[in-house]
Design a protein with these regions (language model features):
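Local sequence-structure signature of Cys/Sec-based thiol-disulfide redox active-site neighborhoods
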Residues: 31-64
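Non-catalytic, surface beta->alpha helical segment in thiol-disulfide oxidoreductase systems
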Residues: 102-137
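Bacterial N-terminal signal peptides that target proteins for export
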Residues: 2-12
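Thiol-based oxidoreductase modules, predominantly thioredoxin-like and allied folds used
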Residues: 65-87
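Loop/turn elements at helix/coil->beta-strand transitions in domains of secreted/extracellular proteins
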Residues: 39-43, 74-79, 106-110
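Structural micro-motif
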Residues: 42, 93-102
Length: 151
């Protein structure tokens, strides 16, 4: 019984990671762009690689965080992009490493890219920055340092 639990637990965790629910059902890049325009929501392109330890960690912690996940489901269209398989899209966005988060506005205009692993508490602030369109008023670092008022 103990051996079965030891074998079953890692298998369940791996299946959960592979089946991580995309908050908005976008089948491909063009579909995600159309969905973002239709719903007037920003688009998050999340580039990952199955062989990337930081990607696995980001999905296990940051993207699995209840607060982050709730914001993504409610306020964003999300497209997970396997950088190893979607080479055209990876080239288009000049992805040189994973994980990488590209944020686009509802019209598809590129806002900014954040490469690397990001902790959940910081990712929530970044999502708020994009959701609230604070990028039109201040740069991201000021928002992170001073908040939405900039003071």
């Amino acid at each position: 019984m103990r051996t079965m639990k030891k074998t079953l637990f890692p298998l369940v965790v791996m299946v959960m990671l592979l089946l991580w629910a995309v908050p908005a059902p976008a089948q491909d890049y063009n579909g995600a762009l159309k969905e973002a325009q239709r719903e007037q929501k920003p688009l998050l392109l999340y580039f990952f690689s199955k062989s990337c330890a930081y990607c696995v960690e980001m999905e296990r912690t940051t993207l699995a965080d209840k607060g982050v996940n709730a914001m993504l489901k409610k306020d964003f269209v999300v497209l997970r992009v396997d950088a190893d398989k979607s080479t055209d899209l990876t080239r288009l966005y000049r992805i040189s490493g994973t994980p990488s988060s590209w944020f686009l506005d509802a019209s598809g205009k590129r806002l900014f890219e954040l490469p690397g692993y990001i902790r959940a508490k910081d990712y929530k602030k970044i999502l708020e920055y994009v959701k609230g369109k604070y990028y039109a008023k201040m740069d991201l670092q000021d928002f992170l340092d001073k908040g939405p008022t900039g003071k």
